[in-house]
Amino acid sequence: MVRAFVLYESEPDAARYEQHAELCRKVPGSTFRHGRVFGAPMGEPKFKYYAEWEFADMDAFKAAARTDEFMATGKDAMEMGVPFHVHFAQVD
């Protein structure tokens, strides 16, 4: 399984983020989730919001990453104006 996850430095505007989430749900071969970060073990969390896609395997991730839908999500995320960090993980 492969996950692509995004950590946002601040919480995006809810209505604007729902528009973004609609784009994210269109990425083929993936399950999309998102939510507000509410805490950390010690002190305030560094990130305020997260999103993730889950793909069955590396081939599914690579295929999805080449789609117009996936590319549109990156462009749209940048247009929201909230700083974010993208990471990829292979889950055993």
Q: Which residues does each predicted region cover?
A:
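Short S/T/G/P-rich N-terminal loop/turn motif that feeds into the first structured element of a domain
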Residues: M1-D68, V86-D92
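Outer-membrane beta-barrel domain signature
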Residues: F70-E79, P83-F84
